């Protein structure tokens, strides 16, 4: 079985660092599936569910990413995410409330900094909601 190293890092912390046999990353071009020995590429990440297939694990490792940059090398994948949250740390009600608060923040922003922060919060909430939707739709 071929493996690659994967690093998922947010601006606050390292979310995942380890091996994977397959990774799906939501990019601006669509979902990108990456196996070991993939051609080198770079892409922008869009809000959504990043999915990792880890050797020895029965379930995928899911991480909500709100945007960022993806770098793929033949033996390593790095995702530098604006905001990233593991699925175990997500809650539907909190994510919906965060989305509403971010939307209100966008409409009430008094300056560019407040607007940018509200957009970042909205992207993070949307990413979590998309990841939770993925989990619900793929329950066995």
From Swiss-Prot:
Gene label: atpC
Keyword Cell membrane: yes
This protein's record includes keyword Transport: yes
Function: Produces ATP from ADP in the presence of a proton gradient across the membrane.
Name this polypeptide is given: ATP synthase epsilon chain
Listed SUPFAM superfamilies: Epsilon subunit of F1F0-ATP synthase C-terminal domain, Epsilon subunit of F1F0-ATP synthase N-terminal domain
GO MF annotation, one: proton-transporting ATP synthase activity, rotational mechanism
The protein's assembly and partners: F-type ATPases have 2 components, CF(1) - the catalytic core - and CF(0) - the membrane proton channel. CF(1) has five subunits: alpha(3), beta(3), gamma(1), delta(1), epsilon(1). CF(0) has three main subunits: a, b and c.
Gene Ontology CC terms: plasma membrane; proton-transporting ATP synthase complex
Xref: NCBIfam families: ATP_synt_epsi, PRK00571.1-4, PRK13442.1
Keywords: ATP synthesis, Cell inner membrane, Cell membrane, CF(1), Hydrogen ion transport, Ion transport, Membrane, Transport
Originating organism: Neisseria meningitidis serogroup C (strain 053442)
Principal cellular location given in the protein's record: membrane
Subcellular location: Cell inner membrane
Family stated for the protein in its record: Belongs to the ATPase epsilon chain family.
Xref: Pfam families: ATP-synt_DE, ATP-synt_DE_N
Membrane topology: Peripheral membrane protein
Disulfide topology: none
